[in-house]
C-alpha cells in the first residue's frame, strides 16, 4: 500500500 493510499484509509 502506497503512502498516499495509506493516508486515505483514515
Swiss-Prot record:
<protein>
    <recommendedName>
        <fullName>FMRFamide-5</fullName>
    </recommendedName>
</protein>
<keyword id="KW-0964">Secreted</keyword>
<feature type="modified residue" description="Phenylalanine amide">
    <location>
        <position position="10"/>
    </location>
</feature>
<comment type="similarity">
    <text>Belongs to the FARP (FMRFamide related peptide) family.</text>
</comment>
<keyword id="KW-0527">Neuropeptide</keyword>
<dbReference type="GO" id="GO:0005576">
    <property type="term" value="C:extracellular region"/>
</dbReference>
<dbReference type="GO" id="GO:0007218">
    <property type="term" value="P:neuropeptide signaling pathway"/>
</dbReference>
<keyword id="KW-0027">Amidation</keyword>
